[in-house]
Amino acid sequence: MARNTLSSRFRRVDIDEFDENKFVDEHEEAAAAAGEPGPDPCEVDGLLRQGDMLRAFHAALRNSPINTKNQAVKERAQGVVLKVLTNFKSSEIEQAVQSLDRNGIDLLMKYIYKGFEKPTENSSAVLLQWHEKALAVGGLGSIIRVLTARKTV
């Protein structure tokens, strides 16, 4: 048995700092300090005003907030992507989809299904056109990967 059992020197941990209501994830703090993830709305708007739809499309899909838990960031990114998708002409959709790799098509499908969850006026018809073209390029595997993915946009 230890000689000094009445000593309280071993109690150096402050258990009040580990209160679950005060818990702050360091990963989220680092992401907030490094800048918000997601597409840059100013860059995308500038490209849309110039009429460069393909570059606006790629800029909207770049830096997607997949790993963040912040719903406001995800909603803002969804709005930017939906704005780009609705500005495309139906004849240009196929070219834009074919410019993506497999991961890009999966990301596009995630945004399409997220748009189906919260439809706005005329967005469903546009999203169905995008879905048709993305399905033709990505196949059924892209739908399965999106529906079974744990990380959402």
UniProtKB/Swiss-Prot annotation:
SUPFAM superfamilies: Arp2/3 complex 16 kDa subunit ARPC5 (SSF69103). It is found in: Cytoplasm, Cytoskeleton. May be a component of the Arp2/3 complex in which it may replace ARPC5. The gene is Arpc5l. GO terms for cellular component: Arp2/3 protein complex; cytoplasm; glutamatergic synapse; synapse. InterPro entries: ARPC5 (IPR006789), ARPC5_sf (IPR036743). Its main location: cytoplasm. May function as component of the Arp2/3 complex which is involved in regulation of actin polymerization and together with an activating nucleation-promoting factor (NPF) mediates the formation of branched actin networks. This is Actin-related protein 2/3 complex subunit 5-like protein.
